[in-house]
């Protein structure tokens, strides 16, 4: 009996193990089928989404085309005046799904082909080249960074900054706000720097465009860019349009080739935009040029350009102010006479004065010094002002580096060779030209008078 019971228990255990293994196998099959089902459902959803997109696209393709127009003004709550090119202007109805408050002048709209009903507001079309002209970051230039232009700063504040910040003053006086200003003068006198400072202090959108960017080879492209430029300025008002090198498109209208005709069309569109936009739209135009003599008189008349500001070369006091501004953060030695440096640069522009400070720092860097000396400034002035390269060294440097002991004879004849080096009785440096020279020391009785030798072998007492 006991043997039979043991056999039965063993048989039951084996049967249980068999069914458990079968159950595990079936669970694996069910899990596999479930994963396949989820994958197929995901694929079905993806295909359904594509089908919906294709149906919507097909529906749009089957619809009739719409006319594109530009809103002139709203007539009432249900009708607006729209300009459609080239048909003309039409008074159209507004679809019930469109809010009349969103329909603003100069916005692009879509009109139904059959009923001319306004059924969609379109985004304004702006050329990517035009949108890149807008400077996203406010310029960091300030009036304190401009030296010697106090009169010009005061005049541009009255024309640009005051109308933007305090338009009520003009309304109280009953006068129209100025539209634009022209900055003219030699290159490097601070025209662009002052325009950037105005944009910084007025907190306006700064749109910078060069006149050469508006010169296109295809007919009508330059005029279209001018139109889109002012459209973008209206969208981001208050804004300042700074047009540098305006003489490239604003020259006098004269007969010429086809390229000149395209430039003239671009200028005519610019004149149209200057006459078209209202001054109260907080759009100000600043133009800069160094050739005011070739600009067309139609561009310079009041109403388009209300003020012309001259930027002359800085005088001595202005050069001193510019030197102080640009040397403010430089590590200078004591006793540097900036006024003397300013006196050494007659007729220099502001950019050249700044270049002197940079070049002086480069001389100090070349000698591995952490400070700038008076001699560095003197050599920088000689280099920036384009003097003789053989004289681009101060007298003190020459005294330290290139001198000979007094020659006690009145006349000495010698032949310079590449290997000759003379210092205290020998050559100091290798000369660049090897000619036969005659050194005449007419002051041979003055024992301690040095004879200076330059790099080309010339000797001076």
UniProtKB/Swiss-Prot annotation:
Gene Ontology biological process: proteasome-mediated ubiquitin-dependent protein catabolic process
Main location: cytoplasm
UniProt xrefs under SMART domains: AAA
Cellular component annotations (GO), alphabetically ordered: cytoplasm; nucleus; proteasome accessory complex; proteasome regulatory particle, base subcomplex
SUPFAM superfamilies the UniProt entry points to: P-loop containing nucleoside triphosphate hydrolases (SSF52540)
Keyword set includes Flavoprotein: no
UniProt similarity note: Belongs to the AAA ATPase family.
This protein's name: 26S proteasome regulatory subunit 8
Species per Swiss-Prot/TrEMBL record: Xenopus laevis
